């Protein structure tokens, strides 16, 4: 009998407390970058019933109305009714932002490679904003080269938000979570969806029967391809029986607490660093995007069925301390050749990544919900497949 395995990933909606915090942090980052593309930003947010605290470090020439950015972001998410216990116009906003530490700025603004040298490469100027390790991943399970469980989980909560905002399901409120369990065959190919869990906040008048029917027909069956659903697929819709109190009224939220949702749903490794609220000199963010860019182009080039790229940095140093490519035995060429090609084609110094992916632009608020990678609904530079031919040529050399 062939062995089959299950793998589960989850996602959360834009109205989830942690995602509210992520979106506020990235909205502040974008507002700063509009005026000052060279700003250094590390904006953290905490949300809870009736309050938002924004804190962290910013070095910039820009002036941003933090209060307005916070309220506009909350309103766009959909918290516009005081009945939700958290509303854009009535929430208390408490900013506490200070200038970046000069000790950190010293290493970021002048990397180890150029200190004391008169001749220098401009891309050596920026040192990594911290030490750390970052991962990027791609697999040929979906057209966007993402693991199927996280891809479906994101699409489910995105569909819920779409139906809520359009008014098609008027009783929906902003907070929601999804979880998808996919069955894989002995060749590691997804064959069916075993279980779908959706918990969605709702008005008190909505009945469980109505929610169950609408979610299955208008969300699950509209999102998950029919070939993955069968008579044995299990649907768990609001399994607690009631989800009226939600958002920051139900749970506090913090920036950076949904790092697995933000990436590959647990299918690939994670270096531990969060993304939102950080400018691109923070390699937690920019190098993770670069690693995804590399992995996606490797798989798209047909050089491997799956690829995981690890990058690692030392604070104040421009060049990565290590580059690793792992293809889990699926590569058509030696992994050492892939690593050599990666170093040859991709400039992995922080300034090189920023230039390669054009990361000084205000593009981050849109990434703060429904995943930073594998997006098909928005245009992100690290999802481009413009290095495929170069990689093919490099490994043949």
UniProtKB/Swiss-Prot annotation:
Gene3D superfamilies, alphabetized: 3.30.300.10
GO biological process terms on file: one-carbon metabolic process; S-adenosylmethionine biosynthetic process
Record-linked InterPro entries: ADOMET_SYNTHASE_CS, S-AdoMet_synt_C, S-AdoMet_synt_central, S-AdoMet_synt_N, S-AdoMet_synthetase, S-AdoMet_synthetase_sfam
One MF term in the entry's GO annotations: magnesium ion binding
GO cellular component annotations of the record: cytoplasm
Record field: catalytic activity: L-methionine + ATP + H2O = S-adenosyl-L-methionine + phosphate + diphosphate
UniProt-recorded name of the protein: S-adenosylmethionine synthase
Gene giving rise to this polypeptide: metK
